[in-house]
Amino acid sequence: MNLQECLDKLARGKISNLALCENGKVKEKFIPKVVDAINEAITRLYSVFPVKEKAVLVELYEGRTEYPLTSEHSWRNAQGEIDDEYNYYIIDTPEDPFMDDIQSIVEIHDDLNRRRPMNDPDSPLGIMIPEPNLIIVQVALDHRVLQVSYRAKHLILSPDDLTSTIQLPEHLFGALFSYTAYLIHSDMNTQEAVANSQKYYAEYQNIITEIQLNTPFAPDKLVSDKKFIKRGWV
């Protein structure tokens, strides 16, 4: 489902009685407001369920222990300075860019096929993770490559691109619609809006509970084809 289809679904259903909709469409001037609510609802769902897992490759250098996982350190942003190798350690390409979308790190392996302990200060192979997008190696004596697998965030949807795809499993769209409707109604001060916001929040909670109890949830994994690539070797 793309963003326009989501807006139309809401306008024909859970927010159809509001002044921001007309003839089954969200009025143009209110589209940013509804898109903001959709983004918040998606963020909520991604925090509850492991919707997507991805991986990023990080090249370690002797003498460096801290590695912020941000795109400013990616290979595709290197400008050819002398210190490129030291400052640009995230291995990506323009075709497969790192998108600054780390929600939480799941596991870490190195190019010797070792699973690295996380947040274990007693292990020389341990990787400390004080922040979701920062890793600290315990020992920086050799040149290694890490594959960091992580739960990914959904990219922020823009009201300027209504063709953007909403990346959710089909069975989560009901929760998305209910939580979005809850946010929009709760932003209004009428008695009817307050009652509707409570109704849609309860509806959202019921859907989430049912999914957690009855639906096996496997994340959309985008890590299986990742290979360790380092300047000419795999």
Predicted regions and their residues:
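Glycine-enriched, solvent-exposed interface loops adjoining structured elements
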Residues: 1-234
